[in-house]
Each structure stands twice: as C-alpha cells, then as structure tokens.
Amino acid sequence: FDKNAEVYNSLFRLGFGFVEVGTITPLKQYGNPKPRVFRLVEDKALINRLGFNNLGAKNVVNRIKSNSKIGLLGINIGPNKDTEDRLKDYLECLKIFHEVADYITINISSPNTEDLRSFHDQTKLNELLQMIDKEKKNLNSKTPIAVKISPDIDEQKIDKISDVLLENNVEAIIISNTSDSTRNGLTNIQRHQKGGLSGKPIEEKSTKLI
C-alpha cells in the first residue's frame, strides 16, 4: 500500500500497531504497465501485477530519515527486475535500511517478478538467508528479519522451507503473498488477468499454510 514510505505516520495515527512499507528495490523502477490492478467485486478479490514499482532505496531511506517514525515500521525489500545479481540487491537494501527499520521483510514471493519464487528452493533460500545473516553480523545489526512466502507451496516443500527458516535466524514468517494459482472458480470478466490473486479466493489456502 505505502510503496514509497509516504504515509506511514498517518497510518500510525489511525491506530495501526505497525506499518510495513515497500516492496523497495535498490534502484528506482516503474513496475509493469498500467492498468495493473483489477478489482473482482463478485469474487471478493483483487488481481495485481504492480511489479515492485518504487522510487528506489536511497530515496525512500532519505524520506524516512526526514520524517521520524512514531510507530513500529517494517521495510519490505526485493530485487530490481533487470538486476544481474538478486542476492546483491537484497544485501544492498539491508545495508541501506537496517538502521531505520524495526524489522526487514525479505520478499521472495511476488508472482510479478520473474523467477523470484525460485528462492523457495531449499538450496537457494538457504544461500540467501546465510548471506543476509552474515551481512547483519558485518553491520553489527540487530534488526529482525521476516520472510514473506507464497501461498502456492505444496506440503512437501513447506517442511523443507520451514527447516531453512529455523536454521537461519529468521524471526518471523509472513503468510502470505498473492497467489498465482488457477482462476477457474472465479466469475468476474477480469479473472484471467495476469498477476497475483488476493482476497476471499485464497483465504482457505493461506490459512491452511499458517
């Protein structure tokens, strides 16, 4: 919602216990072409294909520094679409945000960034989290790390992912991102739009994952 950390203090004043901003990438990017958000009223759902549109990490961190937070602020980070090194992008964002964030969310689950969900592979996820943990030690950072996962994980894979998360000093798991699953049960004319599905249609799936 608050992609560029523009209204987090206003949200705190409304009574929210915490606010998470982002997803933020190292460099500014536009995201996918518009239209990229579709409301499926009859299905009580949304489909979005925003594509990590944001102003870039340095612009956002400067905004946060000039507008002191009055509540618990999480910062959601991810790689740029055209990056040559996604691991490096996560580390760059960690370096930029660890001093201003109350926690940092590692987003590995957006269906709108090609192959991002490959980080649900046990080996790739372990490599990423080991590098995050090593960088935190280099920075002498105590900022808690959360990982945001997909609802489209099968039962065999979730056990392996859970083991990796527990082994790598991850403090929280966010369940879940939007779903890339079939839309056959939906009725709205926009149901086949490309993007991540959220809302009532994935309630059972995400709750089961919890």
Label each region the model flagged.
Residues 1-2, 24, 78-82, 109-111, ...:
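Active-site beta-loop-alpha junctions enriched in small/polar residues
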Residues 1-73:
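N-terminal capping/small domains of soluble enzymes
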Residues 11-12, 97-98, 166:
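Non-catalytic positions within long, well-ordered alpha-helices that form the structural scaffold/packing
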Residues 17-21, 48, 73-77, 104-107, ...:
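Hydrophobic faces of well-ordered beta-strands that scaffold small-molecule active sites
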Residues 23-34, 46-47, 102-122, 182-184:
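Glycine-rich, proline-tolerant flexible connector loops at the mouths of alpha/beta enzymes
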Residues 111-124, 164-210:
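Glycine/Thr-rich beta-alpha phosphate-binding loop at enzyme active sites
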